[in-house]
Swiss-Prot record:
Its cofactor is Mg(2+). The keyword Magnesium applies. This is Phospho-N-acetylmuramoyl-pentapeptide-transferase. InterPro entries: Glycosyl_transferase_4, PNAcMuramoyl-5peptid_Trfase, PNAcMuramoyl-5peptid_Trfase_CS. It comes from Helicobacter pylori (strain J99 / ATCC 700824). One of its GO terms (cellular component) is plasma membrane. Its EC number is 2.7.8.13. GO terms for biological process: cell division; cell wall organization; peptidoglycan biosynthetic process; regulation of cell shape.
Length: 353
């Protein structure tokens, strides 16, 4: 909107630069989140919109009055910044907004159910999975109709492994959406644990998206060119900015939780960025913390069902370390370090080989 007005009508050349608009979107989303979040916290406390804490985590019972659904605020701030700074005629931008709104809506339904029923279960797994599946399928089909190529790339290799048939590609993309959104959701168990690794992952993916959308950079780095995808860089940095604003209130001890309305939106948007920039496999490295958290749950459940023994004191694995006596801040910061290093290694793939 602002982009179309200032560049399209008034020909202010500064707005033709993607990096300027992305930076502007970052700060708009950041300050808007900073401004709106205290108001949301006051409203949520008045409405007693706090998520019940699981009885299996007694050390967290002091957080039972902390309001949740803060994700609504930073998703809203991201969309406002994107509408102002991005080109809304770009299909990748529109699909990115659909992903944020759609996944956040599913999370909101889950958060609302938890608050309304005053339990930690939320929606039924079948209902939640079904809504996420339908949304993922719609976006994946639209990407296919848009003409996004279906080559599968491996980290540090410049040539694709093979070209997936359309149906296989759509199914694979749906899997990426579902696994990533739920992985971020599982990670959101400690103050700031999900938001900072999400920031690192989004920053890495935003670089890949920028390179993919830039003819000169993609040619120099032998990176697959994706026409028009560079505009997604604006939304990615806007989401990073809003997450920094959210972290202002979510750092330990948290004044607000993002809830599923935030974690599912982040996970869905991370998956979307990975798909359009051909980083579905590299996402395992960039989102290493999310992968570790998810694997810990899968292994814990699998071990208990087959051997009646638990591999960890508690899953997801961040609770295991808490049970071992690690302070919450120690778990959080060490996981941040792992995430940062993983993303630095992932970025090396741009130039290596």
């Amino acid at each position: 909107m602002l982009y179309s007005l200032l560049y399209g009508y008034f020909n202010i050349n500064l707005f033709q630069y993607l990096t300027f608009r992305a930076g502007l979107g970052f700060f708009i989303a950041f300050f808007l989140t900073l401004f709106l979040m205290p108001k949301f916290i006051l409203w949520a406390k008045a409405k007693k919109a706090n998520q019940p804490i699981s009885s299996f985590v007694p050390s967290h019972q002091n957080k039972k009055d902390t309001p949740t659904m803060g994700g609504i605020v930073f998703v809203f701030a991201t969309i406002v910044a994107s509408v102002l700074c991005a080109s809304l005629s770009n299909l990748y931008v529109l699909l990115g907004i659909i992903v944020l709104v759609g996944f956040s809506f599913v999370g909101f339904r889950d958060d609302y159910t938890k608050i309304n029923q005053q339990n930690n279960a939320g929606m039924s797994a079948k209902m939640k999975f079904g809504m996420l599946f339908i949304l993922s399928l719609i976006v994946s089909v639209l990407l296919s109709l848009k003409g996004l190529d279906t080559f599968l790339y491996a980290p540090f290799l410049k040539n694709p492994l093979f070209e997936m048939p359309t149906m296989l590609a759509v199914g694979f993309w749906v899997l990426v959406f579902l696994s990533t959104s739920n992985a971020v959701n599982l990670t959101d168990g400690l103050d700031g644990l999900a938001s900072v690794p999400s920031i690192f992952t989004l920053l890495s993916l935003s670089i890949f998206v920028y390179v993919a959308g830039n003819a000169e950079f993609s040619k120099y780095l032998l990176y697959p060119k994706v026409i028009d995808v560079g505009e997604l860089f604006v939304i990615s940095l806007a989401l990073v900015g809003s997450l920094f604003g959210f972290l202002w209130y979510n750092c330990n001890p948290a004044s607000v939780f993002m809830g599923d309305s935030g974690s599912l939106a982040i996970g869905g948007f991370i998956a979307y960025n990975a798909i359009v920039s051909h980083n579905e496999i590299l996402l395992v490295l960039m989102g290493s913390i999310f992968v570790i958290e998810t694997l810990s749950v899968i292994l814990q459940v699998g071990s208990y069902k087959t051997r009646k023994k638990r591999l960890f004191l508690m899953a997801p694995i961040h609770h295991h370390f808490e049970q071992k006596g690690w302070a919450e801040n120690k778990v959080i910061v060490r996981f941040w370090i792992i995430s940062m290093l993983s993303n630095l290694v992932a970025l090396l793939s741009l130039k290596v080989c």
